[in-house]
Amino acid sequence: MSQVVDSLDTARDAAARQSWRASYDAFSSLERSALTPADFELFGDAAWWTGKLEDAIKQRERAYAGFSAAGDKLGAARVALTLSWDHEGRAAYAVSQGWFATAVRLLEGLPESLEHGRVVLTQAMTALMAEGDLPKAIELFDRAIELGKRIGDRDLQVLALSGKARTLIMSGDVEQGLALHDEASAAAVCGELKPFSTGLVYCMTISSCHDVGDIRRAAEWTEAANRWCDEADVSGFPGTCRLHRAEIMRMRGDWPAAELQAVAACEELRDFDRHITAGGYYEVGEIRRRRGDFVGAEEAYATANEWGKIPQPGLGLLRLAEGKVDSALAGITHALDEVDKPVLRLRALPALVEVAMAAGDLKVARAAAEELEAIVDSYKIGGRRTPAFDAVVHVARGRIELAGKDFDDAARSFRRAREEWQRVGAPYETAHARLLLGLALRRRGDEQGATVELEGALAAFERLGAKLDSERAQELLGRVQTRRTFVFTDIVDSTKLLDTLGDEKWRKLLARHDELVRGRILESGGEVVKKTGDGFFASFENPRAAVEAAVAIQRALGDEIVAPDVRIGAHTGEAFRTGADSSDFGGQGVHLAARIGAAASAGEILFSRDTLEGAGTGFRLSEPRAETLKGFAEPVEVVSIDWR
């Protein structure tokens, strides 16, 4: 008997010291018959803080049953509220609501207590997060604060203060909201709060700082939260701490460490909170996308989606990097259609500007940039934009100005973005702004200035391990050639067709032709380099994609009632970027593709034989034939693709 008492005292004392692992081990060694309802409640807490949610729920259910059997309504209500929060985190909303309703019923007629405050706090969080009723949320948070003062419970006061701060920020009162967050977090730093309250206060503060672009404040509170997590004998909240740490590490440019932290966070959080776990997988995708690990990023975004987070705008930017512009635009546009809260729209609008520009839709890009600027201006602190938000606005504005050939204004916008990102301490974003500034300076005719910016961007990308961005910078500096499959399309006998149809019918026919050809190029992951008279010059990452596009073009035209005859030629070879904005290609590979296109007949798809070696297109090919092409000393072997 004395051994049982000793083990029980050990478990209780360890819980009182917040030595949760020791407490859990001691409770686990005891027979269940030796435990009181209060012991089961402590056992559940120990299980929760050591990352064992299922066991925590089991012990808390036993505690609830014990309190209920003893007629202790307050104890039963307390545990019911905790179980409600447990199930809310794992997205078991019906079960959560059931436990919450049970707690409310049990508290009826009882003297005012902390549990009454927890009910009001839960109602306030529901109004904020689920209903989006901000005035109602503020009223309820204020009620919880006052109740906390009356009963002398500091945790209730500070938790409600944090919730009110987050609500004020979402209402547009950023300065007051951040001030309240700082006040609440100071209480957490000073050790005034219990562990659960401490972790929750830190999380709400850091999330709000990210939402308003105050990266400096987010980094400071993240560091404070990490110190607490590292010192505490807990799991669960450390996963959230790791995730915030990963976000800051990514921003600071330490991507390998950031990915390790984010992956570890997902492992720690998966049994606790589906929403935050989904955010963790999304963060993993963001890190991998920047490093050029597209397969890994795709996998992480897919997992985030499975856990309940729409993986935008990251997935859209991944599709853009893959050359799938239409898919990128559709994904980001759909994601924006699903949200109306400014803070959520703010996250996707910069990407929409970039993708819309790539799709050639200046109208959509301009509208997104205007909305972005309006939202950012509603989140000013001290009458000024935060550096991160100011940088985002100027990048979007610079893209619009660059497209409109306002090169001086574009250079000013990108320079401002570079300076602001430097203030934030974000090397990747700084390098990206420098690359765009280099493009603007080149278009303005300042090649020396452009080279300085592009050199700086390249050095940063290489340090960070941003593979694709490094290649892009090298291309712009003319240091590397790129290997692509180049495709040329051309309308056969266009002059004769114009004479037959007349100007108006020809204009409509040409517009329809352009729509079909451009669309099939983009759908197959190609890049429309430029229009060439009444045809197109396009590039593809690989021959298979080029074949798919060429076949799709011919079939689409064949389905039209009236359509021109088009010939298509292609070749894979080395080339280099040309043009003031490096949007064009030059070199022998391009020249040969153009000559093969000119050698094709009406309705024919003609590829160089070398291009299709091992490509596995799945289409029947003609026997090779040798073509003597202008500008080439030796005949070139070509094959025709049977697309019908």
Question: Predicted segments — roles?
Answer:
Residues 29, 358, 463, 476-479, ...:
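Amphipathic alpha-helical regulatory segments at dimerization interfaces
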Residues 478-551, 556:
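Catalytic NTP-binding/metal-coordinating core of nucleotidyl cyclase/transferase enzymes
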Residues 537-644:
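Catalytic beta-strand-to-alpha-helix segment of the class III nucleotidyl cyclase homology domain
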Residues 75-87, 91-102, 116:
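Hydrophobic or amphipathic alpha-helical targeting/insertion segments
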Residues 2-7, 11-24, 28, 37-40, ...:
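Helix-coil-helix junctions within alpha-helical repeat/solenoid scaffolds
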